[in-house]
A protein has these predicted regions:
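Cofactor-pocket helix-loop regions in the catalytic cores of large enzyme subunits
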Residues: 1-171
Length: 171
């Protein structure tokens, strides 16, 4: 993944292996840059410098403090309802929808810069990953994540819906 969006989910608690994968994916952009520059893999110090200067953007939309915030390069503190509104506006912008009912009040203006950053990152991404879950028992989280994945209109876009507890998905 080259852009990751996490909506109202503490992935570190509900899906620790996914949290590990996100932590490792943050280095992908720097490693790809090193490969394109012809830096051999055994030069780990040079690669680590590129990893630090070219991180994969990780947007975390959360209403409280959680362990997943340590993964974030962009942390958006918002109530659960506001986080859904932010992603709805992002989806509308990506679809270039002119009617935007989610911006009707002045309280939304504090999220405008975040919306622009997120739209830019999702447009530039080749393989964006959108994560949402059932941790907060909000069906709107799942709906807006699915709508955002559709709005990205990218065949490489990925959607991950996480159950409410660690190891709770049994097959």
């Amino acid at each position: 993944a080259d852009c990751i969006v996490i909506l109202n989910e503490d992935v570190a608690c509900t899906a620790p292996r996914i949290a590990l994968a996100i932590r490792q994916a943050k280095d992908n952009s720097g490693k790809q840059k090193a490969t394109s520059l012809g830096i051999p893999q055994w030069q780990s110090s040079a690669i680590q410098l590129l990893v630090k200067s070219h991180p994969v953007p990780v947007f975390v939309l959360a209403d409280g403090t959680n362990q997943t915030q340590t993964l974030a390069s962009h942390l958006i503190h918002a109530s659960s309802q506001d986080a859904v509104r932010v992603l709805s506006v992002v989806a509308d912008n990506l679809n270039e929808t002119t009617a935007n009912d989610n911006r009707t009040d002045d309280s939304f203006s504090r999220y405008e810069a975040n919306v622009e950053q997120l739209c830019r990152a999702l447009r530039e991404a080749e393989r964006p990953l959108i994560l949402a879950g059932w941790q907060q028992n909000q069906i709107n989280d799942l709906k807006v994540a699915a709508n955002l994945c559709k709005a990205v209109n990218n065949p490489g876009a990925m959607l991950c819906l996480i159950p409410d507890g660690s190891n709770s998905l049994g097959l």
